[in-house]
A protein has these predicted regions:
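Juxtadomain coupling helices with adjacent low-complexity linkers
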Residues: 72, 76-81, 114-119, 162-196
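A short, aliphatic-rich beta-strand micro-motif
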Residues: 147-154
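N-terminal amphipathic/basic-hydrophobic helices that include classical n-h-c signal peptides
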Residues: 1-16
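Structured interaction and signal-relay segments at domain junctions
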Residues: 79-142
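Intrinsically disordered, low-complexity terminal regulatory regions
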Residues: 23-100
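Short, small/polar residue-rich loop motifs at catalytic or cofactor-binding pockets
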Residues: 19-20, 84-87, 145-147
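Short glycine-/small-residue motifs
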Residues: 101, 161-162
Length: 196
């Protein structure tokens, strides 16, 4: 997979694999070492689940597996409910990308990468609740909105993503209702992933 340059088309996406010139051998236990440059670029950390499948051309393909992505239909609906009840734009993300949004232009945020500051926050399993004079955190790369409330989605002891309510022009601080909504949503998605 990593050694050749090939255009692959599927019904969902068209993408081009770049030639990296890296060839790896499988050891006697069936392990393959993924080079550090690729792990860094693709944000593959120790413990990151990878989906392995083969193509008809004889390729072995590794793809990052997102448990949050498995429940994206529910995530869309839940984001809509959170927006209607909480009155603030809402996004739900896995550890890398936004997978659901409501109250904000979906084209603006869907599939965008999460910021390194959000990555660090959810990696530490911390929640964020902004006060009127609190620190501003931009959770999505390239989007000029700040997190008002953020809670990590945890399932089976692993952090899988986050539920985030974003600031808009009228709302800059979080109240108890918003905290409860975000925490309940994060717990709900954690339970959903444990049951899948």
């Amino acid at each position: 997979m990593f050694a050749g340059s090939k255009t692959v088309s599927s019904e969902r996406n068209d993408y081009i694999m770049k030639a990296t010139g890296i060839v790896r051998r499988i050891d006697d236990l069936g392990r393959v070492v993924i080079p550090k440059e690729i792990r860094r670029t693709m944000r593959i950390r120790e413990g990151t689940p990878l989906e392995i499948y083969t193509s008809v051309d004889g390729e072995v393909i590794f793809r990052k597996y997102s448990p949050v992505g498995e429940i994206s239909g529910t995530a869309d609906q839940y984001a809509d409910v959170l927006y209607k009840v909480g009155g603030m734009p809402t996004v739900i993300c896995d550890r890398d990308h936004v997978i659901a949004a409501s109250g904000i232009q979906k084209k603006e945020v869907l599939e965008r990468r999460v910021s390194s500051s959000l990555e660090d926050l959810i990696e530490q399993r911390k929640s964020l609740y902004r006060t009127a004079d609190g620190i501003k955190m931009n959770p999505i790369e390239g989007v000029d909105r700040f997190a008002v409330a953020c809670a990590p989605i945890m399932a089976d002891g692993d952090v899988n993503g986050a539920v985030i309510m974003l600031s808009d022009k009228e709302n800059s601080a979080v109240d108890d209702k918003t905290k409860a909504l975000v925490e309940a949503a994060a717990m709900y998605f954690g339970k959903q992933m444990e049951d899948v």
